[in-house]
Curated annotation (Swiss-Prot):
Originating organism: Reclinomonas americana
Name of the protein described by the UniProt record: Large ribosomal subunit protein uL14m
Lineage of the species this protein comes from: Eukaryota, Discoba, Jakobida, Histionina, Histionidae
Top-level taxon of origin: Eukaryota
Stored SUPFAM superfamilies: Ribosomal protein L14 (SSF50193)
GO terms for biological process, alphabetical: translation
Family stated for the protein in its record: Belongs to the universal ribosomal protein uL14 family.
């Protein structure tokens, strides 16, 4: 569950390392976001000479959460950190690689481009 002010790790090679959630998109009173949801983030920490700069405001898609994801077969999956992938205004990922695992729930939400960039899908 991601809410406003949550600090997140960036799981791609766009240049940002840490971002902070500004808004969870999808309704005026929506408080929490989970895997596959779109949020607005501010870049807090980044690498030099990359595509994004500190202070940039970008959209991102949540790919990993600490909160368990319950599946229909009775299994659960959770990760050790909260992570996002930065996207542009058209919904295309800014980075060219995704580091770490992502969940197969992203494929159900029609985020196939992110799943194809990921090294492993759980």
């Amino acid at each position: 569950m991601i809410q406003v002010e949550t600090m997140l790790k960036v799981a791609d090679n766009s240049g940002a390392k840490r971002v902070q959630c500004i808004k969870v998109l999808g309704g005026s009173k929506r408080r929490y976001g989970s895997v596959g949801d779109t949020i607005v983030v501010a870049v807090k920490e980044c690498m030099p000479r990359k595509k994004v700069k500190k202070g940039d405001v970008k959209k991102a898609i949540i790919v990993r959460t600490k909160k368990p994801i319950y599946r229909k077969d009775g299994s659960t999956i959770s990760f050790e950190n909260n992570a996002v992938v930065l996207i542009n205004e058209q919904g295309i990922p800014i980075g060219t690689r995704i580091l770490g695992p992502v969940t197969k729930e992203l494929r159900k939400k029609k985020l196939v481009r992110i799943v194809s960039l990921a090294s492993n899908v759980l």
